Amino acid sequence: MFITFEGIDGCGKTTQAVLLAKYLSDLYGEHRVVLTREPGGTSLNELIRGALLGLTDYKLDGITELMLFIAMRRESFVKVVLPGLLAGKIVISDRFTDSTVAYQGYGCGVDLALVGMLNSLVADVVPDITFVIDASIELALARTSLNGFENHGPEFYDRVREGFRTIVANNPHRCHMIDCKSDAAEDVYSTHDRIVALFRAITKDKLKVAK
């Protein structure tokens, strides 16, 4: 099974991905659950991620950004995601193809058909379940310290947020919007409880995990 978490920077998706991975690891065993992230997931990708996050006052144009993240996705897909799925494990990814659509497509204005074509080229797998964590722009920006590479400004993140909402509306069979209202611990775990309940309702007795 392939599960992805999506949302704007600072929405809380990384925390929720980690919490779900721990829940499923406790349930099925750590060796049956793979947690990865984009950009990242492999030693090469983590080096590139570190370099990107260390940039200040440096902007990539939309196409350059798209091609860079697409190449990193291919590396992560063939080294982490696909092997995990073929082994019958539960793979949880903090970001996947929907992020490219929302960020480079809706956020940067890159042609959506081009984004879709490149996504299909490098990763011909569609997630079984996608949890989109929705938080206000104000809350998300207050949660995270964005560097020069990430900090596009509130208007950009508003476009990205609307992009994620459009993705959810267009893919109701796999995408589930989860509202996140605050940073309070009780709200974080309340969100986790909602995700677990939704996961159990979706999978029921259908989930098969490799021994």
UniProtKB/Swiss-Prot annotation:
Function: Phosphorylation of dTMP to form dTDP in both de novo and salvage pathways of dTTP synthesis.
Classification via PROSITE patterns: THYMIDYLATE_KINASE
Binding site for ATP: G7, I8, D9, G10, C11, G12, K13, T14
Organism listed in the record: Anaplasma marginale (strain Florida)
InterPro entries named in the record: P-loop_NTPase, Thymidylate_kin-like_dom, Thymidylate_kin_CS, Thymidylate_kinase
GO cellular component assignments: cytosol
Similarity remark: Belongs to the thymidylate kinase family.
Name of this chain's protein: Thymidylate kinase
Reactions this protein catalyses: dTMP + ATP = dTDP + ADP
